[in-house]
């Protein structure tokens, strides 16, 4: 028996949501020291740019569909030319939610992941060298994600 608190946290995308729902459906009664979570919903994710099948950029709610950890990075990392890197839709998943009702959601990924990784490493290196100031307000979404973990046992889930 695990006595310490245990947290499983998944991306706020279709894969993560599917994994969370599978666990909740498989095991109905979790011990009080376990939490099964998704990364938090962020307001801007309700109308985030996505690439429609016709190639046009359209806003869509990417919660439970495409909000991977990269989306929680500062805007300066996930934007280019003043615009957010759009989400590319990949596959459609059938998911049984925690009420055992089937949902169909598309799994999406942020475009230009390699560029985002490069920009993140570049920012980190500049901050470490003292060439750039760490601005707490730029990391508000990552802070919210970390608070989801840190405070997971403060509220009943």
Provide a role label for each language-model segment.
Residues 1-2:
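Short, surface-exposed loop/strand segments
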């Amino acid at each position: 028996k695990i006595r310490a608190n245990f947290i499983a946290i998944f991306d706020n995308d279709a894969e993560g949501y599917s994994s969370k729902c599978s666990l909740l459906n498989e095991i109905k009664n979790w011990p009080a020291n376990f939490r099964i979570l998704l990364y938090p919903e962020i307001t801007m994710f309700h109308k985030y740019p996505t690439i429609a099948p016709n190639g046009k950029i359209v806003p869509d709610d990417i919660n439970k569909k495409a909000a991977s950890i990269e989306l929680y990075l500062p805007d300066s990392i996930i934007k280019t030319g003043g615009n957010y890197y759009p989400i590319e839709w990949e596959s459609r998943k059938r998911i049984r939610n925690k009420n055992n009702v089937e949902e169909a959601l598309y799994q999406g990924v942020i475009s230009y992941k390699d560029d985002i990784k490069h920009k993140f490493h570049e920012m980190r290196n500049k901050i470490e060298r003292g060439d750039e100031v760490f601005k707490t307000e730029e990391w508000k979404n990552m802070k919210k994600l970390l608070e989801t973990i840190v405070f997971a046992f403060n509220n009943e889930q």
